[in-house]
């Protein structure tokens, strides 16, 4: 598959400022606020000038049940902190309550995360962009009828299902430290989606992703798992990622790629145990981008939130082929980035337990499996189903969904200041022990509340009505003429 260097590609970016207001609760490592921090940082780097920014629609229950079971989505719509006692049996059944708590606005949070990923897939399908970015998406642990690892609705599966309407083969790549179990499970028996996950394996959540898990039925050999040990560094990661992904591209020949960019694989993550720098992590983005395929970039885990914001800002710049300085610009959360106030981070001195021999052995085993694939399986394409977001078809009688607007918003925090710290009594700079790791359910990214100078809207009719009263949310809007 042909690779290109330095080809500038059109990028669109999905963000809703409300996402940063949702709050999982005291001491919970998943902080949607990190999405707002990311957004604010990339705004202050000026990256908004180089891409189209959209506010996603809120995905509805009908969209979510394209994958999830009706009763599970009905439960997510109904459950609230004030009625939990009425749902105790269902909470147990759907694995909601501990790692996946009930919090105010839970379903709306899922709607925003999912809406951005599905809208991104529609944009890619219509060839209206080359790369779509939704840092609030990437919630890869959610199952068909179960929440898991801080994830409730699997926006990735729903986005891939949307891409499959136009693409014969879709490749999913996961560089989060946790195994992408929810996505693998959804497509385990199909040859139209290949899932590739590089993750920590052994005494670690979710406990899946063995080298020998390769898919089943028609999907045999279409699941690729690279189990890793603690402390992998940039050099080792690049040495496995590039050859494995080159072979996958050669054998599978996808026509679209979804890349989950979980940043808990970075050095110093509160729940992680890898030793990647932001540059090392972003090399994966750069390499996948070089294949010049329609690409969806999603968030995922990441629990040291200052580094999450650094990482996803830098990876947005990589998508835009734009170099940004290491000196951080002043931004609303500048104090979080002390004491150095730099974009890039240094690796720690932790031991890399992944020996060259171990990595080579796993790589060769994966190559053997990939050689079992038929070259680019043919797929009988059916009539293309309706797009998930019909209003994007641009009915002339409706308001222009692409009008530019300027949004000033006062972002009020829904928690005390210390809630946004990285350590929270759970060991500043200290890694959790393995028993905690098992319990430490993966954290997936949600959105933020800051709005940007130029933001495009993609909304349903219902939401257009709501938008007529922006003051209800403390948001001032004015149309900005292009």
From Swiss-Prot:
Q: Report if keyword RNA-binding is assigned.
A: no
Documented effect of changing residue 141 to A: Abolishes histone deacetylase and decrotonylase activities
Specify the protein name. Histone deacetylase 1
Position(s), cross-link Glycyl lysine isopeptide (Lys-Gly) (interchain with G-Cter in SUMO): 444, 476
User: Mutating residue 424 to A: effect?
Assistant: Slightly decreases deacetylase activity, no effect on interaction with NuRD and SIN3 complexes
According to the UniProt record, what happens if one changes residue 425 to A? No effect on deacetylase activity, no effect on interaction with NuRD and SIN3 complexes
Q: Which gene encodes it?
A: HDAC1
Task: Extract the Gene3D superfamilies matched here.
Answer: Histone deacetylase domain (3.40.800.20)
**Region: Disordered, residue numbers:** 390-482
Q: Which cofactor is recorded for it?
A: Zn(2+)
What does the activity regulation annotation say?
Inositol tetraphosphate (1D-myo-inositol 1,4,5,6-tetrakisphosphate) may act as an intermolecular glue between HDAC1 and N-Cor repressor complex components.
- Main location, first listed in the record: nucleus
* N6-acetyllysine: residues carrying this PTM: 74, 220
